[in-house]
């Protein structure tokens, strides 16, 4: 693993045309859960920041909750943009390694628990500025790609390969950025999509 957070997606060959709208409607319960977990995630991020700055260590329990949150959000995000047909599980496993309950989306982490850079963590918000700017650009391009994919899937019943690869890359970038933001690693996330 070259970065301590990975995203893998097994794309289906065909996507039912109704999923371009149906998946968004079906994901409403997950969106509510993500909203509530987002509140928990904010508290966990603040606690992690305080603990790492004071001790130089990240407790495994805090890291596990962050891993679960990122994994859950990623699985639901892939479903919302109609890249998959199976309904994402309501899975709240806090292990760093994916438990395999969702065979289409795999998100693994290798959180750094010991020997953390207190200085890097202390200034994390400043260090994130370039990543956030690049992430906003990738996000805008991903929204445009999703609009094109909406019509492509509606007409063809499948994702065009180039668009699919681009959206998978943006998801990979998002998982890495989230791991850095959530203090799971001090390794700066690559700004590319590979």
Please provide the spans of the model-predicted regions.
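Membrane-proximal intrinsically disordered regions of secretory-pathway and membrane-system proteins
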Residues: 1-194
């Amino acid at each position: 693993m070259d970065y301590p957070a990975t995203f893998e997606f097994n794309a289906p060959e065909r996507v039912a045309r109704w999923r371009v709208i149906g998946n968004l409607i079906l994901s409403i319960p997950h969106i509510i859960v993500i909203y509530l977990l987002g509140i928990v995630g904010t508290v966990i991020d603040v606690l992690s920041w305080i603990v790492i700055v004071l001790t130089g260590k990240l407790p495994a329990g805090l890291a596990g909750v962050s891993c679960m949150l990122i994994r859950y959000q990623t699985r639901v995000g892939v479903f919302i943009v109609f890249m998959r047909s199976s309904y994402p599980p309501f899975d709240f496993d806090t292990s760093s390694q994916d438990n395999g309950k969702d065979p289409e989306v795999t998100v693994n982490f290798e959180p750094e628990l010991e020997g953390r850079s207190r200085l890097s963590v202390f200034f994390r918000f400043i260090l994130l500025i370039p990543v956030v700017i690049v992430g906003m650009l990738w996000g805008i391009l991903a929204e445009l790609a999703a609009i094109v994919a909406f019509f492509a899937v509606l007409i063809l019943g499948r994702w065009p390969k180039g668009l699919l690869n681009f959206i998978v890359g943006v998801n990979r970038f998002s998982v890495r950025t989230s791991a850095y933001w959530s203090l799971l690693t001090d390794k700066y996330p690559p700004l590319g999509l590979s």
